[in-house]
Structures are given as structure tokens and as C-alpha cells.
């Protein structure tokens, strides 16, 4: 019944293991199996003993299980207990069998699982060693014997690790003893060694070891080794030879793949892995790999053979050339000795002739299909033709025989040998191509602009530190940094007022239009611009640009949100400053000297400024200097990144031709200035001749003329005697042309002086390194004396309002804006001199 329960329980709980040929199987008959009823079998399967399977057969346990089953069915059975030893009493004979002699150890128990050397001597005696110690004289203790044997084993493993190859070459005792003694002394002198630290602790703490207090173990063992080392060495050598050089200390035996694994002493056997099933597919893949490898090896072999054949052929060719050279030298010497004269062409090394391809190869090359159809073929032919043309133009030898168009499928054996090109050469060729393109672009630009004169109002003149060196000292560029993109890109509202200064602007029909719509390139000096785009002059000597806003240099708007007291949210804007354009002082210059009226204007302007303080979404409007008109500054681009913004201008703004173009422009402007002065003088001379007869004493320079006339005239705004406003306007509309007839000798003399001064200025302009020389005070005074003045409000002033700086040119002197624009060498000192002469 117990066996049946065991079989039933094992079959229910454990998986049947795989049948092996090495496992014995029990053969059971029907009579061996107990015939149990189905109900009893079902009950037995549900009983759990709670012990291991090997202990379920214990008869006390089986008796207890059967009695509990009988009690559950209602039968009366004696209660059975499993006997256990009685632990309630004390064993009286305990002291006789277990002695209580215990000696406290010298130190704590030390052990190391990973480092075995720290656990003490690793050598353990066996029966042979015990027999040797019995017969050994003088007697040796077991601990000393094991320590010496261990030292021998460690020393031989360090000095002769391959002693198993030849056991007869073991070290002698003298060599081993010398090495062991040196090692002991080195350990004793090393403060970091465990033996040294242990000895110091024992001596300092007073710990006794084997009855000796603080004794150094190293020194004790060294003395012991000198006594018994020579006695133990023959025994150790005999055992080493018996082991064939292997270690005397027994080691675990591991599995050896070369031998049979049926050895029962092998430990740590490998886990048996499931053998991989071989199928036809794996065999095919292996065969394919082998075939591919064989083909690659054969190809490599053929390549090596071909390279070797090529090198041998080259060697033979070099040897043949050398033989030919020696024969030529011998023939030359022989001809000199015999005095033979004749042609020596065969004795000179001629250039090798290029081997022409055969007709068959040419036909095959011509019939080779081209990828991509006709378009690819035409592109390939075009590239080939371009490459040939470039080679011919640069003087390099033609490569047409070895050049192959791209996208052409040819066999690998017929790929031409092309020279390798370095990266430096590619970069150099690219730079040369770019420089050549720049030069060609500049040449075409110069040819296209040869018959044109650039007289535009808003021509952009980039700032150059080399050509405008005086900017660093004065702080103001002599040429306004202005570009037409200010109106075109940012100020589309004022495109209608943008005009160009050409000869067509000087006729009578456009005079009214020019007077009503001022130009956009006039220099701004403290002008106020209204929201309607109209100009409000703050100074009688300056005009204003139609610019009514300034593009911010930084971001469009910078805002910050913060939490104030009481949880209120505040929004702060960056750059909330007072509007400097709406200052009352800017309008006080044009107003009368009435104190009450000026104070009222100031109060009104303050109220207006306070009302419009937060109405602007950008930075407060401020005065634009010549640097602010530069596009890079308008766009808010820093000086470090301007090269990115203006990188596209490199082809047309080359520095090597900029200086020449700049000087040509200044010369053209000077010529235009001279022509305008001549036209003004001629027109004024005609006006005086028509208004005063030849005998009239008012024809002199001191006669009364227009407002702001000559040196002897008054500077009022009323017409001079002998002239009137409409008449002078009609005179200004007369045809222009220079004519010496009708001029008085004094006027002609003054005109010649003015021409001489202009010639001197041109000479100074050529001598200057960086631009045109400015006009001095003498030339400005001569220009003032040579022509009368007219007020900016007169018709003549409106007539020449198209010139730079408004109609100040009609006054007979170079206006401030013109002197600064046309003469880069001018500065603020020159402006002050002109102002003094004008006064």
C-alpha cells in the first residue's frame, strides 16, 4: 500500500524523465502491483506526508499515516506516535565523552575565499610524507615540514614554470635556498606586507605565540629553513620526479576534450548541449560559402600572378632600355674614335610614341551602350569636349586617348589608368576657377558700365576702412552710408518721392515737381518728420529725409511679465524712453522770440509727448546718423555676421577694383560740379547783360542783385534794383551754355582764377592717397565772389532743389551736404571754414 502511494504521488508530482541506455529499468509483473480499490487509491493520492520522498518509507511514518486513515473512516485503532528522543533531561555522562579543554586563540579566526595564499600553508601531508618523517633525523615537526615543502613548490613554479617538459633540469638546493632566503628578507623589510604588520601588532600588543612573546615568525622560519631545508630537499625532488614535473599538491581534475570523458575523477563536466540537426538547407549554404571562398582565393591568386608577370615584364623592359643606352654610349665613343660623322638621331633617346588602339577596340568602344539614353550621351560628349578644351587651353598634354565619358559601361580590364588627384590640388583648382569667374564678372560689369555715369541719389557706397581712414579720427564717415533699399524694402510708403538726379531734372517742366517733392537722399540734421510724411524744417540750412520711422537694431519688441503687489500682473516693455523727436526745443528754433508763445508751445509739446508716450510699438524715434543708414545696421545684424548678409556681393564688390571705381566716381562728380558752376555763372552774366546796358554803372559786382548777392550786395530777401522775381525766374529758364562774350574784364579774370583753383584741386585729388582733397577757404571765397547769392526761398533756390542738400547750390558756394558727399576728404573743420566765409 505504501509503495502504491509512493508510485501514485511520484507520477502526479514529477515529470517522467527521458529513458537512457545507462539507466536500469525495473520490470514489474501484474502480481507485483497491489490490487487496491478505486476509492482507496483516490484517497491515498490526496494524502500529503509533508516529508521528503526518500523518508516516506520509514515504518513509523507509515504506521502513523495508516492509523490516521483508519480513524477517519470510523474504525477504532490504537493511537500511534512517531518516537522522538527525549530532550527534557540532562545527560549525566556528557563530561566523560566531551572534554571542556578550550584554549583561546592568539587572534581571530581569519579566512579568505578568493585569496588562498592568506589562509596559510597550502601543502598538506600525505602517507608518503608521514613515512618520511618517521625515518627522518633529526626529527622535524609536521608544520615545519609542510612550510618547507610549500616554499619549494612556490619557488619552482616561479623559476621553472615548464619543468614538466624536462624533469632532469630541476634547480639545485643552493639555487632554491638562495631564492627562498631573499624572499623572506624582502618580506620582513617591506612595511606593507601582512607578515610585517602582524609581527608589529604582536610585539606592540604583547600577544604570545606558542609561548614566545612578540617573536618574529619570518626570522624563526629562516633559521628553521637553514637547519632542515637540506634534509627535506631530496624527498621533495624524488616526489617531483615521480609526478613528472607536475604539482605534488593534488588539484581538481577537469575535463579534457582530447581524451575520453568516461574518467570518474573528472569534476565540473560540461553541460551536454543539444546537437544541431543537419538539414539539406544548411548543407547547401555551407557548400555555397565554400565555393565562394574558393572563387575569391582563385581570383586573388590570379591577381598576384598577374602582378608578378607585370613586374617581371617591367624589369625586362628596364633591362632592355639599359642595354640600348649602353650600346648607344659605345657607338658614340666608337664614332668619335673613327671620326665618323653622320646623323645621330638613333643615338638620342626619343620620346616614346603613344600606342594607338586597334581598330577592333575603337569599334567596340563606339558600339558600347550609354546609360541614360541620348541625353546622357550628349552630356557625356559635352563633358568630354569641355575637358579636352580645358586641357588644350591650359597647355597640359591631351588626355583624349585615355578619357572615358561618365556613365559608360566598359569591362574592368579596359578601364584606363588615371592619375590620383590630391585634395589640395582639387581645392586649388576650385579657388582658381572662382577667382577666374570673379575677374570675368568684373570685366563684363566694367564693359557694360563704360558709357554710363552713375548719378543716382541713393547709390549704395560701402564703407571701407582702408579708403576712409579719416573716419577713425573724426568719427563721421565722409560719404553717407546710404542705400536705395531703405526706400524700396522698408519705406514703401514714400516710393513716390524717390527720384534720380539726371539732366532731365534741370528743364523747366519738372521744376515745380522737384520743388514740391523733396529727394530722399538729403542729409538729415535735426529735422522733424510728421506722421503724414511732410517735412518740418528745424534749421534753415538743412533738409530732411522722408523717413518717418527707424528699423530697430534689436528685436521688434521685448516684453516682460511680472507679478506685483496684491497679485496684480504687470507687463513691462523694453526701451520706454522719452521721444527725443518731439522735444519742444527742436521747434523753438523756427519760432519767433516771443517768450510766452514759446512757453505755450513747450507745454503743448509736453502734453502731446505724454499722451503718445505708450503709443509706439517700437523703439523711440531718434536721429539717424550716416552709420545708421547702412543696411546691415538697419537689419540689426552685428559686425561679426555681416559677411553672411553681404556674401552675395563679393563678385561685384571686389576690393582690388573698388579703389579705382571709387576715384572714377569722385572725378565724375567733380566734373558735374564744375559744369553746374559754369552754367550758373553764364546764366547770371546773361541776366546782368539783359537787365543793365553796357554803360550802366549797376553792371559791376557791387550792384544790387538778388538776396544774398555778391560781396557788395545786401543779404535781404527783396529783389535788387534792376531785377525782379519773375524776370530772374525767366532768366533761369534760358538755355544753358558757356560763352565768354558779354563778360567784363574783371568778371573774366575772376572766372579764370576760379578755373585755376579748380585745377589745383584736381591735382591735389590725384596726389591724395585716399580720395579727393577738400576745398580750402580761398577756393570757397573765390566761388562766393564769382557769383551772386540767392535765398533758398527764391525760384532759383527751388530750381536747384534737386541737388544734394536742397537748393543751397544756387547760393554760389558748395553746400555742406555736397562737400561731404562729393569730397570724402572733407571734415567738420572744412564746414566751419565755409560757414565763416559765408558770414
Curated annotation (Swiss-Prot):
Q: What is its main location?
A: nucleus
* One of the GO biological process terms: DNA repair
The Gene Ontology CC terms held by the record are:
NuA4 histone acetyltransferase complex; nucleus; piccolo histone acetyltransferase complex
For bias type Basic and acidic residues, the affected ranges are 608-620, 828-839
Bias category Gly residues: which stretches? 697-713
Q: How does it assemble?
A: Component of the NuA4 histone acetyltransferase complex.
Q: What role does this protein play?
A: Component of the NuA4 histone acetyltransferase complex which is involved in transcriptional activation of selected genes principally by acetylation of nucleosomal histone H4 and H2A. The NuA4 complex is also involved in DNA repair. Involved in gene silencing by neighboring heterochromatin, blockage of the silencing spreading along the chromosome, and required for cell cycle progression through G2/M.
Designated name of the protein:
Enhancer of polycomb-like protein 1
> What is the scientific name of the source organism?
Yarrowia lipolytica (strain CLIB 122 / E 150) (Yeast)
Q: Which gene encodes it?
A: EPL1
Amino acid at each position: 500500500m505504501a509503495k502504491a502511494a509512493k508510485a501514485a504521488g511520484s507520477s502526479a508530482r514529477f515529470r517522467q524523465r527521458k529513458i537512457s541506455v545507462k539507466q536500469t529499468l525495473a520490470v514489474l509483473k501484474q502480481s507485483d502491483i497491489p490490487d487496491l480499490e478505486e476509492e482507496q487509491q483516490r484517497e491515498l493520492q490526496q494524502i500529503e506526508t509533508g516529508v521528503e520522498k526518500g523518508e516516506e518509507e520509514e515504518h513509523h511514518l507509515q504506521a502513523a499515516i495508516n492509523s490516521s486513515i483508519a480513524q477517519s473512516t470510523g474504525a477504532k485503532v490504537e493511537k500511534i506516535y512517531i518516537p522522538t528522543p527525549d530532550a527534557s533531561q540532562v545527560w549525566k555522562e556528557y563530561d566523560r565523552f566531551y572534554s571542556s579543554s578550550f584554549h583561546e586563540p592568539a587572534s581571530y579566526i581569519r579566512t579568505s575565499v578568493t585569496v588562498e595564499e592568506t589562509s596559510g600553508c597550502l601543502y598538506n601531508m600525505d602517507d608518503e610524507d608521514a613515512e618520511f618523517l618517521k625515518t627522518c633525523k633529526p626529527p622535524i615537526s609536521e608544520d615545519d615540514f609542510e612550510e618547507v615543502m610549500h616554499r619549494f613548490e612556490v619557488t619552482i613554479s616561479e623559476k621553472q614554470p615548464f619543468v614538466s617538459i624536462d624533469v632532469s633540469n630541476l634547480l639545485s638546493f643552493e639555487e632554491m635556498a638562495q631564492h627562498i632566503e631573499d624572499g623572506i628578507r624582502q618580506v620582513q623589510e617591506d612595511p606593507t606586507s601582512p607578515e610585517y604588520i602582524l609581527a608589529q601588532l604582536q610585539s606592540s600588543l604583547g600577544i604570545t605565540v606558542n609561548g614566545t612573546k612578540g617573536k618574529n615568525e619570518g626570522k624563526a622560519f629562516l633559521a628553521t629553513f637553514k637547519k632542515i631545508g637540506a634534509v627535506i630537499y631530496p624527498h621533495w625532488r624524488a616526489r617531483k620526479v615521480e609526478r613528472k614535473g607536475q604539482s605534488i599538491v593534488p588539484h581538481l581534475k577537469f575535463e579534457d576534450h582530447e581524451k575520453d570523458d568516461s574518467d570518474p575523477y573528472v569534476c565540473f563536466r560540461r553541460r551536454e548541449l543539444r546537437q544541431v540537426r543537419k538539414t539539406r538547407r544548411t548543407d547547401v549554404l555551407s557548400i555555397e560559402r565554400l565555393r565562394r571562398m574558393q572563387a575569391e582565393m582563385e581570383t586573388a591568386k590570379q591577381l598576384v600572378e598577374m602582378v608578378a608577370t607585370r613586374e617581371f615584364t617591367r624589369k625586362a623592359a628596364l633591362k632592355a632600355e639599359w642595354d640600348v643606352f649602353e650600346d648607344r654610349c659605345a657607338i658614340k665613343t666608337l664614332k668619335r674614335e673613327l671620326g665618323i660623322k653622320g646623323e645621330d638621331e638613333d643615338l638620342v633617346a626619343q620620346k616614346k610614341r603613344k600606342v594607338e588602339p586597334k581598330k577592333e577596340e575603337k569599334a567596340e568602344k563606339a558600339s558600347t551602350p550609354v546609360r541614360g539614353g541620348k541625353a546622357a550621351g550628349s552630356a557625356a560628349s559635352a563633358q568630354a569636349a569641355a575637358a579636352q578644351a580645358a586641357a588644350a587651353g591650359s597647355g597640359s598634354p591631351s588626355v583624349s586617348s585615355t578619357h572615358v565619358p561618365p556613365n559608360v559601361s566598359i569591362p574592368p580590364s579596359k578601364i584606363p589608368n588615371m592619375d590620383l588627384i590630391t585634395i589640395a590640388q582639387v581645392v586649388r583648382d576650385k579657388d582658381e576657377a572662382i577667382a577666374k569667374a570673379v575677374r570675368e564678372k568684373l570685366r563684363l560689369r566694367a564693359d557694360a558700365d563704360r558709357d554710363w555715369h552713375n548719378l543716382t541719389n541713393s547709390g549704395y557706397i560701402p564703407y571701407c576702412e582702408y579708403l576712409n581712414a579719416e573716419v577713425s579720427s573724426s568719427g563721421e564717415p565722409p560719404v553717407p552710408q546710404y542705400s536705395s533699399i531703405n526706400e524700396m524694402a522698408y519705406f514703401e510708403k514714400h516710393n513716390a518721392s524717390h527720384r534720380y538726379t539726371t539732366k532731365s531734372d534741370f528743364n523747366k517742366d519738372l521744376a515745380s515737381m522737384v520743388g514740391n517733392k523733396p529727394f530722399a537722399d538729403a542729409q538729415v540734421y535735426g529735422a522733424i518728420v510728421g506722421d503724414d510724411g511732410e517735412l518740418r524744417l528745424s534749421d534753415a540750412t538743412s533738409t530732411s529725409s522722408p523717413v518717418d520711422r527707424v528699423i530697430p537694431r534689436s528685436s521688434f519688441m521685448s516684453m516682460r511679465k511680472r507679478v506685483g503687489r496684491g497679485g496684480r500682473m504687470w507687463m513691462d516693455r523694453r526701451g520706454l524712453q522719452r521721444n527725443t523727436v518731439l522735444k519742444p526745443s527742436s521747434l523753438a528754433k523756427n519760432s519767433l522770440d516771443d517768450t510766452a508763445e514759446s512757453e505755450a508751445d513747450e507745454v503743448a509739446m509736453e502734453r502731446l509727448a505724454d499722451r503718445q508716450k505708450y503709443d509706439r510699438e517700437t523703439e523711440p524715434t531718434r536721429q539717424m546718423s550716416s552709420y545708421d543708414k547702412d543696411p546691415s545696421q538697419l537689419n540689426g545684424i552685428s559686425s561679426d555676421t555681416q559677411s553672411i548678409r553681404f556674401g552675395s556681393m563679393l563678385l561685384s564688390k571686389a576690393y582690388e577694383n573698388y579703389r579705382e571705381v571709387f576715384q572714377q566716381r569722385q572725378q565724375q562728380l567733380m566734373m558735374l560740379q564744375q559744369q553746374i558752376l559754369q552754367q550758373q555763372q553764364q546764366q547770371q552774366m546773361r541776366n546782368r547783360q539783359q537787365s543793365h546796358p553796357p554803360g550802366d554803372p549797376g553792371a559791376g559786382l557791387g550792384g544790387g542783385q538778388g538776396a544774398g548777392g555778391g560781396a557788395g550786395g545786401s543779404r535781404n530777401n527783396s529783389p535788387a534794383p534792376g531785377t525782379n522775381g519773375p524776370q530772374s525766374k525767366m532768366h533761369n529758364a534760358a538755355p544753358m551754355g558757356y560763352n565768354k562774350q558779354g563778360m567784363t574784364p574783371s568778371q573774366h579774370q575772376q572766372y579764370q582764377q576760379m578755373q585755376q583753383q579748380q585745377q589745383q584741386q584736381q591735382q591735389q585729388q590725384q596726389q591724395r592717397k585716399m580720395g579727393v582733397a577738400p576745398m580750402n577757404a580761398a577756393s570757397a571765397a573765390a566761388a562766393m565772389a564769382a557769383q551772386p547769392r540767392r535765398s533758398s526761398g527764391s525760384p532759383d533756390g527751388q530750381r536747384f532743389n534737386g541737388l544734394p542738400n536742397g537748393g543751397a547750390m544756387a547760393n554760389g558756394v558748395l553746400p555742406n551736404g555736397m562737400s561731404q558727399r562729393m569730397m570724402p576728404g572733407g571734415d567738420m573743420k572744412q564746414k566751419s571754414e565755409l560757414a565763416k566765409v559765408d558770414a
